[in-house]
Amino acid sequence: MIKFAKIIIDRKNNEYRNLHFLPEVFSLMLKYERFMFDDYFQANDIVKALFDMVEASGRFFWAIVDSETNELMGFAYFDNFIGNFQNLHSAEINTCFARKYWGSQVRFVAKKFIKYCFKNYGFKKIKATVFRENLMVKGLLRSLGFKKEALLKGETIKNNKLQDVEIYSITRREKCKQKKLI
């Protein structure tokens, strides 16, 4: 089925885990960066930017792996935390999956991952920020029970144009109401 392999880069404590997935994570990030980043994402050294992103996520960066083939399906990480690491209130989820897994496989994995995060980390709320034109991700979020919370008009610049951003979220309480989750 699937496994969530935590990727850790902790230079301060000299701890590194599952770095063998980083070349594939890097490849996915480059392939789909137009869906992930705005014009303010300035990375002269994209490899260093990935390492910094993994390290900044504070142990909340995962390779999502097909456990039968050990093939990378995608990755997920959290940022913009509210609370502290002993008492997490909310965070923003970011994901990217290889195209061959888009559709029902991503939906299955996403459902498992959201359940895993609520159960194991005690989040009260998980948020997602989506570029307005990313219809596929918005549909996925809605199918998982996320609700649109806000439209931030002209929130950023993408392709030298003002870009609207939508915020979606789901709370632990809402997730508990869904029969087979948590």
Residue ranges: model-predicted function:
Residues 1-29, 61-182:
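Acyl-donor (CoA/ACP) binding surface of acyl/acetyltransferases
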Residues 14-15, 36-39:
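Short, N-terminal intrinsically disordered low-complexity segments that are rich in Pro/Gly
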Residues 34-37, 100-101:
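Short, polar/flexible loop-turn hinges at active-site or ligand-entry regions and domain interfaces
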Residues 39-59:
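Active-site rim helix/loop that mediates acceptor-substrate recognition in acyltransferases
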